[in-house]
Structure formats: C-alpha cells, structure tokens
C-alpha cells in the first residue's frame, strides 16, 4: 500500500506516545485519521482538538465509515494492543492492510537521512535534544519523538527543506529493525524486554543486527564501554562517546548553583563554555551524544552552544513541577533499574542535604519478575520509597509477582510504604516532604496534578502555622 495515496488511517492504540506522532503526521498530510485508545488522556484530547477522531470503547460500530474501505485505509497497530482486540479482529477478517507502528515509521523515513537514537535508556531525551539542535539551526529537521518536547509542545516536528529525520529507535518487539539509519547513537544495552527476547544474549544480538542497518557513508556513535560488538557495513564510521572519555566527550565540567557548564570535545573541534538548559548531570552524557550527531552533520559550533542552552527538556523526563525553597516535586519516566539509579543519583547531586522521597509504580509484571532485586537496589539509594501496584500495560498478572517483591528487598532502615494509586494523597498528608519524585512509565503521571496541588496546600498550611 502506498502511504502517499491512502485516504484514511486508523490507529488501534492511538494515544501511545509513538503512535500519536504518526497520528499528527498523517493529519498534517490531510488524511482522515481516527482510532481507538483505552482511556482519555491529555494527549488524546489534544489529538482530537487537532482533528483526529478517537473513541475509548472497543466497538467496531464506532469505527468511522471513512475508515471502512480496505482499498484506501491503512490500519496501524501498536504492540501494546492484544491480538484478540475486537476492532483488530474486524480489520484482520476483512482483509485490511495492517502494519505495526515501526513499519509505518520505517516507510515514511526511508527516503530521508535518518538520525536515530537507540538504547535501553536515555534515548527519548537524547533524540529530543538532537531534534532541537537541528530544528533551531540553519539545517532544520523532521522528528518523530518518544516524548513531548517542552520547547515545541509536541512529539512531531516537520520541515519542508531538511533532508534529516530524527527518530527515537525503539528496541521493543525489535521495532528498530524496520529503520534505515543514516547515523545512529546507541546509548545503552542493559537487558530489558526479556518477555520478548528471552535472554540477554538475544537482546544484544538484536542491537548487533540493528547496527548492520546503518547506511554506508553514515556513522555509529556508541557509548564507550557498553557490551556490544557492532557489525556495521563497509563505509560506516564508528565513534565512541561518554561523559568523560571517547571520541566525543565533555571536559571542564562545572556544576553549581543550579547550573551546569561544560566544554564539548570532538575529534576535530572543541566548543567551550556550553550551558545546559536542563541542568541535571545525566544530561551531560545525553548532550554529548546529541552534539556529536549535530556536529557530524553540519550544525555550527555557535548553533550547538545556543541550542543546548535553549533546550527545555521533555515531559516526564526530570520534569520539575514545583521548585522552591520549601519543596521540590518532579516527575520522571524512569522504569528500568539503571534509569532509576541514574535519576536518583542526579537528584542526590542537586539536593544532597535534603530528604528524597519517591513514589514508584513498577511497569509490567515480567519486568518486575526479572529485575525486582535490581529495582530494590536502585530505590534503596533514596531516603523514602512509596510503592504502588504494578502497571500491567499489555500484560496479564503473574502469580506471586507484585510490588511487594521490591518492597521486601529494600535496604534495612529505609522508610517505606505500599498503597494503591488512589491512596497516594492520603499517604502524603502525614509525611514531611522535602524532595518528591514520581517514577514510572505507567499512568502514575495522571496523579501528578493532584499531588502538586496537595504539596502546595501542605506547604501553605505549614507557613501559616509558623506565622
């Protein structure tokens, strides 16, 4: 099916962060766009406001007539939707063209110079940072992102003139094997998605295959020290990067007073005195990778310096909601033990003298089963942990796998509690909160506005009591 000539696109799972970028793309092309999602969210409401027709009931009768012609309709599927989904069964039984999100993304971006960011963690911030560096430069870019850019309020950037497309390359379900990168960063290969891959070896082999897809004339920029043997084609340059060493790295790092300055070192240049727009130490390494992609493709030194300073971050990625002398509250998407450890260490660096509390919602039964001890070790770096029930996403429960597995393995002496999501506000009322972070990739973020209100109310009452 020719994507240019189709008239309508139907999304089964329209509200996912990756799917919604494609929804926006097809709306920009003037297609009729409709779809199903499980629950309303601010993102699905935004998509409706932008012209998409989205419903929240698994019901074939709610599919618009414009999306019932198999000759002119493309159906896009997210792996999170079960195969027995009523609408998916309807499309399958009636001979519609059904493609995975990654397959569609690969087709759309095949004719452009794909700048892809892959890896277990860090890819959303790094790809969004890369997109910003290009978009604000003389080169520009199109971008399909895995998070909402705070600079642009969207996960889709469009350019009519740029040959470059920045893509977050997702390893789940081997999705990134549909891509044809011109250049790629690989940030990390810590094992994940073992429900799909089975073993760490298979997970690494998937990344090895991904490196074979990079086009001759392009480049691989791989984090120094990760356990991966790239298998690039002839004519593909291979570079290393990290915070402190590699072909691309940072030097003269200055952290203090809520600010971070670095010098960026490349094989053929040095850009001094770069100020990070989102001053958390984890963004030094993310920034090095983004600047490497920008530098290799002609973004000027001054454009890189200005872009790093004007970068405002990504929703749910070290996303500050309250930041004052009384209380700090932020939301973070970290859902893998390594990500949580990095996030906690970054917070500890910023607020070393304060009590740090986290509300953690584990994501997936399989991930909890496979990594509960690692989760407990990472969370034990905190002063206090509040655990809520596992967010199942696409999975059914596994007997014996609950948040209590993590709870029981937290370090002795840590303040800890367990509750249902609906009980979070009541739990917080009895606590002395100095720095609070919500962690997880599930729906914990839906509670962030209420948590913010409750914290502001608590601190106002404290002030009144003191006065």
Predicted regions and their residues:
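Beta-strand->loop->alpha-helix junctions that form or flank phosphate-binding loops
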Residues: 36-37, 55-60, 99-103, 144-146, ...
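Short internal beta-strands
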Residues: 31-38, 220-224, 357-360, 382-392
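Nucleotide phosphate-binding/pyrophosphate-handling subdomain across enzymes
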Residues: 2-8, 18, 25-29, 256-258, ...
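Phosphate-binding loop of NTP-binding sites
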Residues: 25-31, 62-68, 79-222, 228-237, ...
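C-terminal helical cap/extension that packs against the catalytic core
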Residues: 50, 237, 376-434
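Short, basic, low-complexity termini and linkers enriched in Ser/Thr/Gly/Pro
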Residues: 268-270, 432, 456-467
